[in-house]
Amino acid sequence: MSRTENIEHVEESVESELKQPSMYKVILNNDDYTPMDFVIEILQLFFKKDEQQATEIMLAIHHKGKGICGIYPFGIAETKVAQVNQFARQNQHPLLCSLEEA
């Protein structure tokens, strides 16, 4: 095997090993009880949205039944879902945060 063939083989191996992680959407689901201000607070606190972005997402949740807070690798998405659901329960709101593959 020539040196050129070895280099090409190594380049192929490296490219196939560097796959992007699967990404997941973090979703807030609408309910009839959680105040809009609380949803905005969640979006600012956990997803670092400014007031305008948080308001737009909150309105999408209100009108469409759900809204995307962000798209993250699985581990981060799973952590954010758990944090939001725990924070909502601590504040006695039924708000549900979930994830789905992007």
Swiss-Prot record:
<dbReference type="GO" id="GO:0030163">
    <property type="term" value="P:protein catabolic process"/>
</dbReference>
<protein>
    <recommendedName>
        <fullName>ATP-dependent Clp protease adapter protein ClpS</fullName>
    </recommendedName>
</protein>
<dbReference type="InterPro" id="IPR003769">
    <property type="entry name" value="ClpS_core"/>
</dbReference>
<dbReference type="InterPro" id="IPR014719">
    <property type="entry name" value="Ribosomal_bL12_C/ClpS-like"/>
</dbReference>
<comment type="similarity">
    <text>Belongs to the ClpS family.</text>
</comment>
<comment type="subunit">
    <text>Binds to the N-terminal domain of the chaperone ClpA.</text>
</comment>
<dbReference type="InterPro" id="IPR022935">
    <property type="entry name" value="ClpS"/>
</dbReference>
<dbReference type="GO" id="GO:0006508">
    <property type="term" value="P:proteolysis"/>
</dbReference>
<dbReference type="Pfam" id="PF02617">
    <property type="entry name" value="ClpS"/>
</dbReference>
<comment type="function">
    <text>Involved in the modulation of the specificity of the ClpAP-mediated ATP-dependent protein degradation.</text>
</comment>
